[in-house]
Amino acid sequence: MLMITSFANPRVAQAFVDYMATQGVILTIQQHNQSDVWLADESQAERVRAELARFLENPADPRYLAASWQAGHTGSGLHYRRYPFFAALRERAGPVTWVVMIACVVVFIAMQILGDQEVMLWLAWPFDPTLKFEFWRYFTHALMHFSLMHILFNLLWWWYLGGAVEKRLGSGKLIVITLISALLSGYVQQKFSGPWFGGLSGVVYALMGYVWLRGERDPQSGIYLQRGLIIFALIWIIAGWFDLFGMSMANGAHIAGLAVGLAMAFVDSLNARKRK
């Protein structure tokens, strides 16, 4: 048995299962915190993932509804709650995901009250040799954000990717990815621009790389990122490198973070294969 993906909404999961049944592929749903979709015939995994990518692009396509009618599951027979916004956040995010989100919000509020420079004096990458033993600085630069759009964009991705890693692989794995990527992406960025930078984007890019490659090489890990999203990440890096949008971007942190995530995913998936 191979787990293909998970859906928060069991009706959506049932729609995909019904459609694959019309294609001659039998999937099953197991209800845990979410609706986990499992495949018995692992030889069909690549085909199922390709169909899943198309399904996720437009789950409301009439062909999927038609498949549910054909299978007789338009009512799904499943009972599920309608989650309000904060309940949906809580459903996907583990404790580490929440702690980092709250820390970023608290730091952002402090920056609005005290000013960016005052907070950066305490949290920025060491900007003076006398500060090199203030070890928190090698990580806390990731908590600082300089605009509402900056923090919303990063926290949305952090919640989506970090939450998935924590739920599937544990809090320890998320902590390791976060600390290593914050340290190395910060080191590279300060070589590019000096110590005055901030943001969680280096960690977010590490999570993008990790989730995508781990899902490709080790589907049984239960994490997955559409190829379209990793292509978007690469386009965003290129746009930032050539300053196509006229915005200040931490290009060094983005590239380093992505490289860290890919490297960690390669090692972890290699170890997972050896254990089989």
Curated annotation (Swiss-Prot):
<dbReference type="Pfam" id="PF01694">
    <property type="entry name" value="Rhomboid"/>
</dbReference>
<keyword id="KW-0720">Serine protease</keyword>
<feature type="transmembrane region" description="Helical">
    <location>
        <begin position="142"/>
        <end position="162"/>
    </location>
</feature>
<keyword id="KW-0812">Transmembrane</keyword>
<dbReference type="GO" id="GO:0005886">
    <property type="term" value="C:plasma membrane"/>
</dbReference>
<dbReference type="InterPro" id="IPR038236">
    <property type="entry name" value="GlpG_N_sf"/>
</dbReference>
<comment type="function">
    <text>Rhomboid-type serine protease that catalyzes intramembrane proteolysis.</text>
</comment>
<keyword id="KW-0997">Cell inner membrane</keyword>
<keyword id="KW-0472">Membrane</keyword>
<feature type="active site" description="Nucleophile">
    <location>
        <position position="201"/>
    </location>
</feature>
<protein>
    <recommendedName>
        <fullName>Rhomboid protease GlpG</fullName>
        <ecNumber>3.4.21.105</ecNumber>
    </recommendedName>
</protein>
<dbReference type="InterPro" id="IPR022764">
    <property type="entry name" value="Peptidase_S54_rhomboid_dom"/>
</dbReference>
<comment type="similarity">
    <text>Belongs to the peptidase S54 family.</text>
</comment>
<feature type="transmembrane region" description="Helical">
    <location>
        <begin position="192"/>
        <end position="212"/>
    </location>
</feature>
<dbReference type="Pfam" id="PF12122">
    <property type="entry name" value="Rhomboid_N"/>
</dbReference>
<feature type="transmembrane region" description="Helical">
    <location>
        <begin position="169"/>
        <end position="189"/>
    </location>
</feature>
<keyword id="KW-1003">Cell membrane</keyword>
<dbReference type="InterPro" id="IPR022732">
    <property type="entry name" value="Peptidase_S54_GlpG_N"/>
</dbReference>
<dbReference type="GO" id="GO:0004252">
    <property type="term" value="F:serine-type endopeptidase activity"/>
</dbReference>
<dbReference type="GO" id="GO:0006508">
    <property type="term" value="P:proteolysis"/>
</dbReference>
<feature type="transmembrane region" description="Helical">
    <location>
        <begin position="250"/>
        <end position="270"/>
    </location>
</feature>
<keyword id="KW-0378">Hydrolase</keyword>
<dbReference type="InterPro" id="IPR023662">
    <property type="entry name" value="Rhomboid_protease_GlpG"/>
</dbReference>
<feature type="transmembrane region" description="Helical">
    <location>
        <begin position="94"/>
        <end position="114"/>
    </location>
</feature>
<dbReference type="InterPro" id="IPR035952">
    <property type="entry name" value="Rhomboid-like_sf"/>
</dbReference>
<feature type="transmembrane region" description="Helical">
    <location>
        <begin position="229"/>
        <end position="249"/>
    </location>
</feature>
<keyword id="KW-1133">Transmembrane helix</keyword>
<feature type="active site">
    <location>
        <position position="254"/>
    </location>
</feature>
<keyword id="KW-0645">Protease</keyword>
